[in-house]
Amino acid sequence: MNWIHGSMMNLTGLYHAIRNATGTAVTKPIRKPSNTEIKLLPISLNSKPLETIVWMEPITLIAFGKHLDVLGMIDKTVHNINATTNEIKFTGNDMELGIETIVEGEIIEKGKIAIDAKLFSEIVRKLPDNDITLTTDSNNNALITCEKSKFNIAGKSGDDFSYLPAIIKDKMITLSQFQLKEVINQTIFSIAINDNNKMMTGELFEVNEGTLKVVGLDGHRIAIRNIKLEGRSDDVRVVIPGKTLQEISKILNADAESFVNIYFTNNHVLFEFDQTHVVSRLIEGDYFKISQMLSNDYETKVSINKKEFLDSIDRANLLIREGDKKPIIINILNGLL
């Protein structure tokens, strides 16, 4: 008899988990030796790890789009649900960006399966808020059951899934989830959308003497944010894809007491927080020399209340029609802006 019994959580917890890497959580019995059954129980757990799982898949499909065959599972098109240890692990990976979320559980019999991420996510979103059971057979077909709803979907062998690369945890920095989320949101708008210049689609993360500098630019504007780090901070200078940072920002919480460890290698960056690991390739090459773009030799310098300035821009925008790209004209005269 094949059993997997996972930690208890409700449908909300599952939805949250799927947003993090891929899948479902918690599990229960199986009728045949070749089957694996995962059952979600209606008791809430920490919902944050699960939240990241459903998130992971839609990004991949937007960015990469194709459902590849098993050997080419470049693989965020698929959720891999792995219950081969004492925890249930959800993984999504497209070889550029990968995420893994762990849910603790009592594993009665081990197993794993790869499931179409988009389809699985959509099914979970639409199910009633009650127990969910996922059963697989020897042909990697999956049966998802919740109350009177049943879905049969074809899966693939979890053995052929492309797992996340091992990262050497040498150079690292630590900051709160709130700080990282804020830093990303205050700079990411300045990166380029297309990849005519790939360097502009990423952000510079430079750590020097305990200070993190994050820079984004697109050739027309530049955003720079400096933050003083506490604790260990190794000097690094890397360029992280903007897509990676945008997606990480979505799953970080605003808690100043929850921390993120960021590890850097020559080719990858690893973000560790809660029960989630996110691995991304770095953009290769030397970033622009920011110091040469900035100058203290200016004709006019203005200090202004930020909120009042933003409110004024919002009011001026009322007169600009949607799709119109006319600039806002700023006049500075007699102490007024």
Regions found by a protein language model. Name each.
Residues K66, K76-L337:
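Structural preference for solvent-exposed beta-strand-turn elements
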